[in-house]
Regions:
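Fe(II)/2-oxoglutarate oxygenase catalytic core
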Residues: 1-98, 104-130
Length: 130
């Protein structure tokens, strides 16, 4: 787990990418990210279909993201699927890749069948939708 300077560098880099993605694709009214979550999925681990929208006071999660930390050769299964209509969008497994999607989109992590999948996930808050 990153601490100290490593954590500061990582959080700064992720924040820069959040701003870039939002400017390029979403243009949401955002305030800032929650603390990052380091996720470990071992054989049999999964996360069933859900949405990330969470309301706190006058703010809500608007943008979700995941960063692939494992080499795809180190595990099987564990695909992240985001639903946008009938067919899910399966996110890539390339180590270091970062994917963004609106927090209101249904998504899931399929069961890991071999090895361990590691990822960094997070959410960005903004004022409630108008």
């Amino acid at each position: 787990k990153p601490e100290g300077k490593e954590a500061t560098w990582l959080f700064t880099h992720v924040t820069d990418l959040i701003h870039y993605a939002n400017r390029s694709w979403y243009r949401y009214d955002l305030i800032g990210p929650e603390n990052l979550q380091y996720s470990i999925y071992k054989v049999g681990s999964f996360y069933s279909e859900h949405i990330d929208t969470l309301y706190k006071n006058q703010h809500c999660r608007k943008l979700s993201f995941t960063v692939q930390l494992s080499n795809p050769d180190e595990y099987e299964g564990g695909e992240v699927e985001v639903y946008n209509g009938e067919k899910p969008i399966v996110l890539g497994k390339e180590i270091g890749s970062m994917y963004f999607f609106p927090s209101y989109m249904v998504h899931e992590v399929k069961p890991v069948t071999r090895g361990t999948r590691k990822a960094l996930v997070g959410w960005v808050h903004g004022p409630q939708w108008k």
